[in-house]
């Protein structure tokens, strides 16, 4: 069965994927540690604490201390995963990530739930709309967001094996199970969902499911879509973007500020490598508000309908 034919009603949050995978990895490698900031239940590390208590440290509500502790552990050969919310893991900890983790290029992983607008009713203060953009500008940092449960598990596994700082972003809400358990993923290499010739759609994270639904409808209307899951925005798969220039019309879709996120990363390659038209769908350079998640997406035009409309305008 192709991905376009899959039942997308079966859902699971990608933060749950992290919680399940980190237990597996911790049992396989005693050097893997989880550092919590008193929100283990929300970040799905409770099972890790129960099963591997000697590999867990809770620093309390002290994210900056967590980053410094992780850096210290990394110098002793440990592989620490700092687990927190995306808005804190990218901004509250930023100075420590830059100076203590990325500058010395230490093997620290920042694993963050509640990415993008998914905190929803918690309001704009808790919605990380700039996290991936901020951290992709820091040297040595890898930036990743899986689209669903299984892709996230595979990417967490790879993050544990690759040396260096990695930022992993997860959803708070449940998302459709797009991929099968046996699908393979490689950090820095796009996941091609479908080939096409009229327009290219590049999405990541939760917006892959929206791009998938839009693709189905566009195909019904005779528009051939190339659909890519760009789970890694740094290092970006430049070759995959350049290949889209054969089509020349690209739409990017992300639950992130359109400035300095996936859309900007794609535009950089297009500007450097050839001619093409790019339309960015994402958070419209504005703070969020307290509202249901789907309503926040709608307010920013991050919808199936807007993807279809934008595609037709380009064609």
Regions found by a protein language model. Give the residues of each.
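Thiamine diphosphate
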Residues: 1-169, 174, 184, ...
């Amino acid at each position: 069965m192709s991905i376009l034919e899959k039942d997308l009603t079966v859902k699971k949050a990608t933060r749950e994927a992290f919680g399940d995978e980190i237990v597996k990895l911790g049992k396989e490698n005693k050097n893997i540690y989880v550092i919590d900031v008193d929100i283990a239940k929300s970040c799905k590390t409770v099972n890790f604490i129960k099963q591997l208590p000697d590999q867990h440290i809770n620093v309390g509500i002290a994210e900056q201390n967590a980053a410094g502790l992780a850096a210290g552990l990394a110098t002793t050969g440990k592989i620490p995963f700092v687990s927190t919310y995306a808005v804190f893991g990218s901004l509250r900890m930023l100075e420590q990530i830059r100076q203590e983790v990325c500058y010395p290029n230490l093997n620290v992983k920042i694993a963050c739930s509640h990415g993008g607008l998914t905190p929803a009713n918690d309001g704009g203060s808790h919605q990380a709309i700039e996290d991936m953009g901020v951290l992709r500008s820091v040297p040595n940092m890898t930036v990743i967001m899986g689209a669903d449960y299984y892709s996230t598990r595979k990417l967490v596994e790879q993050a544990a094996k690759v040396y260096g700082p990695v930022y992993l972003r997860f959803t708070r809400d449940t998302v459709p199970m797009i991929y099968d358990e046996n699908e393979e993923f490689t950090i820095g290499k796009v996941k091609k969902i479908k080939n096409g010739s009229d327009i290219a759609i590049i999405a990541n994270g939760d917006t892959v499911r929206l791009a998938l639904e839009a693709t189905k409808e566009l195909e019904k209307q005779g528009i051939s879509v190339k659909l890519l899951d760009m789970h890694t925005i740094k290092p970006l798969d430049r070759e995959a973007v350049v290949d889209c220039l054969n089509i020349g019309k690209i739409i990017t879709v992300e639950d992130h500020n359109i400035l300095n996120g996936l859309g900007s990363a794609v535009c950089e390659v297009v500007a450097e490598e050839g001619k093409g038209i790019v339309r960015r769908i994402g958070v419209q350079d504005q703070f969020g508000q307290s509202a249901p998640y789907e309503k926040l997406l709608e307010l920013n035009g991050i919808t199936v309908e807007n993807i279809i409309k934008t595609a037709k305008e380009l064609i």
